[in-house]
C-alpha cells in the first residue's frame, strides 16, 4: 500500500450488487462501505467465510477512504485471468447491435406488457445479429436463457459469453415472441 503499512484489514458490508458507475460499458461491481484507500486497489474483498468474492477497484468520494467502494466480482475476474493465461488477451463476445432502453410507451405500443429487454436501434451489416436475422426494432428479451430486464444488462452478458458460441435469443417482433440462433462474433 502507498503508506508502507502491510497487513491492513478493514471491515464493511456489501450494500449492493450489479452496480454500474460509468467507468466502462461492461460493469458489474459489488458496492461496499469497507474502507478502500488510495493505492490499495487490487486487494481482495472477503466474505464472512474467508472466501475472496471480489477485487477492490474504485471508490467514489473526494478523499481516500471516505466514500463508497466498488469491487469486481471474483467470477468476472476469473474469466479475464483464465483468458489472459490461455490467449494472452481477453476475447469478448459480440452481437453487432446498437441498443436502447424500452420505455413504458414503447412497451405499450408493442403490447409487451411491461418495459423490459433491449430495443435494437440498428444492426451492423455482416454482424452475427445480421446473419442471424435480428432486425431494427426487435426487442431482445432473453439471451441464452438469461432474461434481459434492462438494456444495460445485455452488453455485459454478451461480452462474458465465449466467442463462437451459438446462443438463443428470445426476441419480441410484430407483437409476438420469436427465437433466433446467433453465433457470437468477437468484439474488436
Describe each region flagged by the PLM:
Residues 137:
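Conserved catalytic motifs of ABC-family nucleotide-binding domains
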Residues 1-116, 121-126, 132, 151-166, ...:
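Serine-dependent protease modules
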Residues 143-148, 174:
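Short strand-turn-strand beta-turns centered on an Asx-Gly dipeptide
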Amino acid at each position: 500500500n502507498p503508506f508502507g503499512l502491510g497487513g491492513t484489514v478493514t471491515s464493511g458490508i456489501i450494500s449492493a450488487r450489479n452496480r454500474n458507475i460509468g467507468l466502462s460499458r461492461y460493469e458489474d461491481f459489488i458496492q461496499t462501505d469497507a474502507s478502500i484507500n488510495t493505492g490499495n486497489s487490487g486487494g481482495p474483498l472477503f466474505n464472512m467465510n474467508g472466501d475472496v468474492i471480489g477485487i477492490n477497484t474504485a471508490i467514489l468520494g473526494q478523499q481516500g477512504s471516505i466514500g463508497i467502494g466498488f469491487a469486481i466480482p471474483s467470477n468476472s475476474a476469473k474469466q479475464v485471468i483464465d483468458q489472459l493465461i490461455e490467449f494472452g488477451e481477453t476475447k469478448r463476445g459480440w452481437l453487432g447491435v446498437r441498443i436502447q432502453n424500452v420505455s413504458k410507451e414503447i412497451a405499450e405500443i408493442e403490447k409487451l406488457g411491461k418495459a423490459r429487454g433491449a430495443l435494437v436501434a440498428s444492426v451492423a451489416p455482416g454482424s452475427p445479429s445480421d446473419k442471424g436475422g435480428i432486425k431494427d426494432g426487435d426487442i431482445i428479451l432473453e439471451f441464452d436463457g438469461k432474461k434481459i430486464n434492462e438494456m444495460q444488462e445485455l452488453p455485459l452478458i454478451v461480452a462474458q459469453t465465449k466467442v463462437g458460441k451459438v446462443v438463443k435469443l428470445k426476441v419480441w417482433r410484430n407483437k409476438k415472441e420469436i427465437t433466433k440462433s446467433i453465433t457470437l462474433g468477437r468484439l474488436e
